[in-house]
Amino acid sequence: MKLLNQMELLLSTCKNRYVLTREVAEYAKKTPSPNAVILAIWLMARKTK
């Protein structure tokens, strides 16, 4: 549950939220590991700031 909250926080602080969400969705389809998806979200959020 805590990880979901972190993801929400990252998405809400991201300026280009819709692009980020689409990228994450594409990545999540390819990657079975939730941790890898969360890492990707974090990296993308850092990249867009």
Swiss-Prot record:
GO terms for cellular component: chloroplast; DNA-directed RNA polymerase complex; mitochondrion. It is an enzyme of class 2 (transferase). It catalyses: RNA(n) + a ribonucleoside 5'-triphosphate = RNA(n+1) + diphosphate. Its EC number is 2.7.7.6. Keywords: Chloroplast, DNA-directed RNA polymerase, Nucleotidyltransferase, Plastid, Transcription, Transferase. It is found in: Plastid, Chloroplast. One of its GO terms (molecular function) is DNA-directed RNA polymerase activity. Belongs to the RNA polymerase subunit omega family. May be involved in RNA polymerase activity. This is Putative DNA-directed RNA polymerase subunit omega. It comes from Cyanidioschyzon merolae (strain NIES-3377 / 10D). The lineage of its organism: Eukaryota, Rhodophyta, Bangiophyceae, Cyanidiales, Cyanidiaceae.
